[in-house]
């Protein structure tokens, strides 16, 4: 191969390619959207904080027919980046607190209890009250606490 036909990896080549791709995307008119997938999967997300709620939103956008359940006993959702604004006196104390259900997508179910047991052999979660929640897929998004 001659030097003129080889692709050269350089910052200039990358920026040129990225600029061309950005221009092409800007002129496309409609945003790219992933195709929806039909499924009857039972998906349980353990934790309804920022990660669990975000995942539930993405899954309901992309999956048709999935049974999406979140399990979290905490009734309030804490917007943690707002804590610094409260501490600085820029926002009132209640600024960063809202209801957990305010952040969940339509079509997702919230079991407002804490999980007591994960039973991977039976593919189920047992809540603090003894309710059994079966799953095909489990996501543990309980955060740091």
Label for each model-derived stretch:
Residues 113-122:
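A conserved short coil-to-beta-strand element within the FAD-binding core of flavoproteins
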Residues 23-39:
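A short, basic/flexible loop-to-alpha-helix module at the beginning of a structural domain
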Residues 125-127:
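SH3/SH3-like beta-barrel fold
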């Amino acid at each position: 191969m001659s030097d003129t036909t080889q692709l050269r990896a350089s910052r200039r080549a990358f920026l040129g390619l990225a600029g061309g791709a950005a221009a092409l995307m800007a002129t496309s008119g409609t945003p790219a959207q992933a195709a929806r997938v039909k499924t009857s999967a039972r998906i349980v997300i353990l934790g309804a904080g920022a990660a669990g709620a975000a995942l539930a939103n993405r899954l309901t956008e992309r999956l048709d027919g999935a049974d999406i359940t979140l399990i979290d006993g905490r009734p309030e959702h804490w917007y943690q980046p707002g804590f610094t604004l409260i501490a600085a006196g820029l926002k009132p104390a209640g600024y960063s607190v809202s209801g957990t259900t305010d952040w969940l997508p339509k079509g997702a179910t919230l079991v407002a209890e804490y999980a007591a047991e994960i039973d991977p052999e039976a593919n189920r979660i047992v809540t603090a009250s003894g309710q059994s929640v079966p799953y095909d897929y489990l996501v543990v998004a309980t955060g740091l606490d």
